[in-house]
């Protein structure tokens, strides 16, 4: 909690800002009121507690997701927003949720195993007991190489797996923890981010023609350069291959699949999907990720030709057919330019090992809080401000893509709808609970002077970094893909990438309250300025239609 004395130190520099030549005029008095409301009367952690403690996790299209969505819609109505509704899209795929699970090692010694099921796994129909078999399957993101390696695997293991729990990874000595798990950007790191000479050129090679990096550390940069059409194709190829593997294991009569995740350490588990969420594809065999230390123990025991027996139970609720999901929408009507819209948003869905607090309950809570601040202050805004809380992000940006396609245009054909001309811009938050340090321009350099001016009142909070760089993996890309201004904020990493991302530690306790309060203030101020700017936000040239890429 910030003291009132520190509050005055935060606010004083705003009134000393010189008028910058060529930059937009700022309503510094209003920004001061926004800061006061965001810090002294914050509700952001209350929003987050409801989303994570009570309604988390929120797997897309699950009953838990819809319960959380109804709560969020109710909170938006309570704040006083207009046109609040759940906007259906789909079909998505199966609804799936885990109601109970346990994994225990019975031999050579008893041990309860810290585990999490992978989504769209089948139930065990009660506890089942069996021996494990070590049949490691190599992992690679290169679809061609993965398919070749699976063909070899199939030939080697056909007829040898029936009635077994298959352990899909070998034993591995954990990497040394040489870096701190919790990190805030230094001034030097922010300067390096800001100094990027240009946004990364996209690699428009076909998926089959891509040259994959040998160094896993280079994969992040490699993925960053993939256009959405290629990334979507890659994602589909990975899911298709996972489905083929699951069919093989089902045909072989395995009892279940066990694995470790290389991201898991110190007792955490990281869990996503076992395969396809489509009802046309079978549910995977009961599939679990086990914390690395326990999994490695089991694998080392098996390497000593010693039997490992486990008892596994998994009860899931899954729909027989594909179902729709929904986005949560609400707005504050504008004034003289009410037909024009400024949007904010965050993905609302989560994975299921934790409660979805930092990914992305934090972003959703901040955006709800932004709307509360603007509504509470009863500020006058020329343009309508609309919030979108998206589902299906974790499975492929499905919810925001569906919304953009329905309202603004189709990224595949670039056939644009009338409302495309009326959306000024979209602002997104989805990188954990770390404080905002600036913004990615997403290659839109015409936005630089606007963001520099809008973020200047937050210089004391060190939130003024502006970089031409792109960032990916979240919902602003759905807007950018049809030529609409879409932006994601730069955030301190904290322990998001090292501990909480898609893990059992993604809980309320890992969220940073003061950082989320500050994020609420920053975004509310930016949105207010965008909503009252004389012109709409500048746009980049329209991208190529995905069909032409």
What name fits each language-model region?
Residues 46, 85, 373-398, 421, ...:
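Short helix-loop-beta-strand segments that form the rim/entrance of peptidase-like active sites
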């Amino acid at each position: 909690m910030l003291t009132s004395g520190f509050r005055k130190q935060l606010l004083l520099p705003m009134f000393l800002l010189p008028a910058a030549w060529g930059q937009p005029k700022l309503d510094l008095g209003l920004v001061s009121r926004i800061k006061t409301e965001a810090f002294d009367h914050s509700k952001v952690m209350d929003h987050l507690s409801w989303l994570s403690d009570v309604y988390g996790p929120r797997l897309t299209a699950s009953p838990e997701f819809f319960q959380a969505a109804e709560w969020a819609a109710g909170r938006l109505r309570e704040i006083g927003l207009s046109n609040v509704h759940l906007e259906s899209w789909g079909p998505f795929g199966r609804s799936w949720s885990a109601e109970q699970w346990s994994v225990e090692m019975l031999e050579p010694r008893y041990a309860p195993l810290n585990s999490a099921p992978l989504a769209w796994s089948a139930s065990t129909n009660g506890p089942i007991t069996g021996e494990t078999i070590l049949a490691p399957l190599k992992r690679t993101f290169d679809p061609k190489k993965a398919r070749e390696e699976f063909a070899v695997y199939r030939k080697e293991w056909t007829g040898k797996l029936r009635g077994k729990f298959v352990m899909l990874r070998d034993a591995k000595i954990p990497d040394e923890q040489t870096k701190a798990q919790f990190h805030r950007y230094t001034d030097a790191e922010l300067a390096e981010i800001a100094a990027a000479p240009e946004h990364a050129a996209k690699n428009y090679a076909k998926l089959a023609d891509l040259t994959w990096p040998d160094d896993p550390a280079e994969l992040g940069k490699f993925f960053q350069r993939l256009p959405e059409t290629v990334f979507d194709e890659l994602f589909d190829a990975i899911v298709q291959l996972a489905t083929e593997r699951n069919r093989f294991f089902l045909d072989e009569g395995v009892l279940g699949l066990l694995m470790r995740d290389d991201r898991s350490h110190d007792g955490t588990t990281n869990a996503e999907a076992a395969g396809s969420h489509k009802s046309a594809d079978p549910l995977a065999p009961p599939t679990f990720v086990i914390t690395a230390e326990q999994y490695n123990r089991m694998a080392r025991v098996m390497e000593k030709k010693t039997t490992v027996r486990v008892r596994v139970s998994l009860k899931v609720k899954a729909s027989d057919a594909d179902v729709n999901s929904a986005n949560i929408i609400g707005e504050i009507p504008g004034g003289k330019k009410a037909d024009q819209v400024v949007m904010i948003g965050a993905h609302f869905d989560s994975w299921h090992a934790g409660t979805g607090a930092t990914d992305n309950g934090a972003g959703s809570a901040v955006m709800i809080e932004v709307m509360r601040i603007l509504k509470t202050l009863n500020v006058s805004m020329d343009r309508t401000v609309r919030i979108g809380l998206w589902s299906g992000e974790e499975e492929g940006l499905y919810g925001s893509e569906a919304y953009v396609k329905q309202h603004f245009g189709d990224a595949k054909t670039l056939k644009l709808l009338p409302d495309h001309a009326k959306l000024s811009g979209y602002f997104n938050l989805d990188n954990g609970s770390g404080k905002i340090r600036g913004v990615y321009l997403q290659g839109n350099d015409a936005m630089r002077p606007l963001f520099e001016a809008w973020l200047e009142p937050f210089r004391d909070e060190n939130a003024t970094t502006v970089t031409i760089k792109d960032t990916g993996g979240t919902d602003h890309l759905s807007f950018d893909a049809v030529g609409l201004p879409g932006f994601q904020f730069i955030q301190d990493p904290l322990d998001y990438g090292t501990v909480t991302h898609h893990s059992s530690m993604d809980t309320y306790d890992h969220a940073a309250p003061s950082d989320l309060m500050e994020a609420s203030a920053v975004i509310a101020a930016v949105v207010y300025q965008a909503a009252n700017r004389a012109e709409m936000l500048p746009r980049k040239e329209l991208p190529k239609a995905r069909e032409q890429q």
